[in-house]
């Protein structure tokens, strides 16, 4: 049962959305997250060499967390159950790559069984999805989002470090077949890398009747190689697509929605723009993140993490954990500072935080 007092912060924002990372590991090496391939190094090296005063960044040291530090399914279920009791109703399972977590369909089933969870989704790169899809659907997964940054096999491999385009495309088809609607597909747009594919990706969304999201490149890569010049602003993407397609604005009834959306004139599919760099949506943010090792993050770009694992493993009561969650949320940052002089990139990459 939802408590009378909402889980709110000091700015009046009420939390409804919990992102749950189940692993910090990933089988891709995406250029915007874990750029550990030679092709990624070459891409960024060329960008830094072009600067008048190049200052190569110091990469974040990546160390996978040992299994003993990762929350068990029972611990994850407990946190979600308590969060739902405080008003959370949307849960998204993330990673790393969540399908690398052995028995993930068991966890999905447990989360689906929590009264009050009205939207249970997963974000995946799609590479392993065909092996797990039916079990996930039967367990209660309602929606799924895939990453698809390129439709060109060579460019796809350059971006992700894997020769996996065919697998991801097959996963998208399978998700539609299983009724995991609406199937969402995300593309991180990086200038000089895949911005020439914007129209092709949008046309793919229209033909496949997908909900496609173009996302601005964010400073969450382990190479600390993010540069503002590599960001393609959302307005630029929209302008380019409006010149090619008949797009019609979609009005949202949810002020906390991160994407500005447009439908295609023929009624098949839609595109959305997620622009955290050029058009931050912090003022309506209603999201929390639970990392795989049991930390709560109140902002994707926060430098502070709040440990729940110690409470979970230290015998804390439900009431104690609920009280701690309220304290954490009350301290939620007003906004991020990307692009400002005081911005400091988090010490964890997107793969470790959970998208």
Language-model-derived ranges and their functions:
Residues 41-42, 62, 152-159, 221-225, ...:
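A short acidic, helix-capping loop that chelates divalent metal ions and anchors anionic groups
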Residues 11-73:
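Canonical Radical SAM [4Fe-4S] cluster-binding loop centered on the CxxxCxxC motif
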Residues 70-93, 100-215:
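Radical SAM/AdoMet-radical enzyme domain recognition
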Residues 98, 188-192, 219-222, 227:
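Short histidine/acidic/glycine/proline-rich micro-motifs that form metal-
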Residues 29, 33, 154, 159, ...:
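Residues that scaffold the ATP/ADP-binding catalytic core of kinase and kinase-like folds
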Residues 57-71, 75-94, 315-335:
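Short Fe-S-cluster ligation motifs
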Residues 28, 153-154, 280, 306:
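Glycine-centered loop/turn positions within well-structured domains
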Residues 1-18, 203-207, 217-220, 224-355:
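Auxiliary Fe-S-binding modules of radical SAM enzymes
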């Amino acid at each position: 049962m939802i408590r009378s007092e909402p889980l709110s912060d000091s700015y009046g924002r009420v939390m409804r959305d919990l992102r749950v990372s189940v692993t910090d590991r990933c089988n891709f090496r995406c250029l915007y997250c874990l750029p550990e391939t030679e092709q990624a190094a070459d891409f960024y090296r060329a960008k830094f060499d072009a600067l008048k005063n190049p200052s190569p960044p110091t990469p974040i040291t990546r160390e996978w967390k040992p299994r003993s530090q990762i929350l068990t399914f029972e611990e994850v279920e407990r946190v979600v159950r308590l969060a739902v009791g405080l008003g959370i109703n949307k849960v998204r399972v993330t990673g790393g790559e969540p399908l690398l977590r052995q028995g993930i369909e068991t966890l999905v089933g447990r989360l689906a069984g929590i009264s009050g969870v009205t939207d249970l989704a997963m974000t995946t790169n799609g590479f392993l999805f065909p092996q797990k899809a039916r079990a996930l659907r039967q367990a209660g997964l309602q929606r799924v989002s895939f990453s698809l940054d390129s439709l060109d096999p060579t460019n796809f491999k350059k971006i992700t470090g894997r020769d996996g385009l065919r697998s991801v495309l097959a996963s998208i088809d399978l998700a539609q077949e299983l009724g995991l609607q609406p199937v969402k597909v995300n593309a991180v747009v990086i200038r000089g890398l895949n911005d020439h594919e914007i129209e092709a990706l949008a046309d793919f969304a229209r033909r496949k009747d997908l909900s496609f999201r173009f996302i601005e490149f964010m400073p969450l890569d382990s190479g600390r190689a993010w540069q503002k010049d590599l960001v393609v602003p959302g307005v630029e993407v929209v302008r380019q697509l409006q010149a090619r397609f008949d797009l019609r604005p979609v009005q949202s009834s949810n002020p906390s929605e991160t994407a500005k959306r447009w439908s295609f004139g023929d009624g098949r599919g839609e595109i959305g723009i997620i622009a955290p760099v050029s058009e931050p949506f912090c003022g309506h943010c209603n999201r929390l993140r639970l990392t795989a090792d049991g930390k709560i993050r109140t902002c994707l770009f926060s430098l502070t993490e709040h440990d729940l694992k110690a409470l979970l493993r230290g015998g804390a009561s439900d009431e104690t954990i609920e009280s701690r969650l309220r304290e954490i949320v009350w301290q939620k940052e007003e906004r991020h500072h990307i692009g400002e002089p005081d911005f400091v990139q988090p010490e964890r990459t997107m793969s470790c935080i959970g998208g």
